Amino acid sequence: MDIRQVRETIEMIEEQNFDIRTITMGISLLDCIDSDIDKAAEKVYTKIVTKAKNLVAVGDEIAAELGIPIVNKRVSVTPIALIGAATDATDYLPLAHALDKAAHEIGIDFIGGFSALAQKGYQKGDEILINSIPQALAQTSKVCSSVNIGSTKTGINMTAVRDMGRIIKETAEASDMGAAKLVVFANAVEDNPFMAGAFHGVGEADVVINVGVSGPGVVKRALEKVRGESFDVVAETVKKTAFKITRIGQLVGNMASERLGVKFGIVDLSLAPTPAVGDSVARVLEEMGLETVGTHGTTAALALLNDAVKKGGVMACNQVGGLSGAFIPVSEDEGMIAAVQNGSLNLEKLEAMTAICSVGLDMIAIPETTPAETIAAMIADEAAIGVINQKTTAVRIIPLGKEGDMIEFGGLLGTAPVMKVNQASSVDFINRGGQIPAPIHSFKN
């Protein structure tokens, strides 16, 4: 590495808010299954604190050694619905408490995997877990939850969609922060390092390390140098910048897996914003020539950004995965917040952008009076985009306050303006239940 590259890396960290967003250790809990829920909870706690006891120390050590901030150290586990199903318990709160206790013990930021995979129907554990979510998130501080309700191969479980509309409402009523730690997916991935949607897939190794990077500020600074140039130049600039960002992610992942003695999984090629000025995906899109995010051209700008990030990132590491794209959470991105406040960005435009971006309707506050069926219909729309386009989509909606209020979450979760929601009813549509069949192009065999 020559002196120019060293200087570039220092600038990325000091001036452009570059960091490693997360080192996430995925841990399989399949060997913790027990017919007694208290015994299962004890096994879960023991395995997590044994496998991840050095995660925080190693993360801090690497950060100090390289001079690169590693913002979060996290753990993801096997979907708890699979562990709980072996018991006769009527709720899975003991397992949620075991996860939270383990997370506090090892000093991590979040633990994901209070999850269910219900894309084609409910097994016993799925329904129990889903109904446990509101209290599980209210009674814990570090546990994150997710439910997969659809996939391109199976279609959309509309019964689960209906139930999740209700659960999101109940979760927001049980605790202010609960709904911010709950994601509803279509086409959920098994190696996602980002919260709140991370869980450790059943096809994964026993323990793996996955890395998520963050660098919208770096991309924006690079684009400032090519103002007025053609889109060919813009795409190439983003690609080269994404390569540099991801290369550092690969290095950190290799070092962490080596020192922890576990397998290295993937680098997630996502641009993840924070509420800090200079760390915004929205401002990257505006740098391409948009007056404000939400105006016409926004979806095209996002498409270019997403694709170029992937092309550059793939060259930089041997295993990529997770969600891999650009995140567009409202509360976690100061540019998105500004666009909502000035009226240029609404829910309908956000939905269009989710056909392109890394996930979906993310960290969006809506009025607390919004009916559960309307929330379920938002989930159904997002799931349809994901299922038809063979991509991951998700909903992390927070029904709090009234339209125009500002909801303060703090930290990386930021601040969310409460957005206007269409008032027309979707009740009869949602109450049908059943399964929307898989699309015709899903039959590949």
Curated annotation (Swiss-Prot):
InterPro entries: UPF0210. It comes from the Bacteria. Coiled coil: none annotated. SUPFAM superfamilies: PFL-like glycyl radical enzymes. Pfam families: DUF711. NCBIfam families: PRK05313.1. Homodimer. Belongs to the UPF0210 family. This is UPF0210 protein SSU05_0296. It comes from Streptococcus suis (strain 05ZYH33).
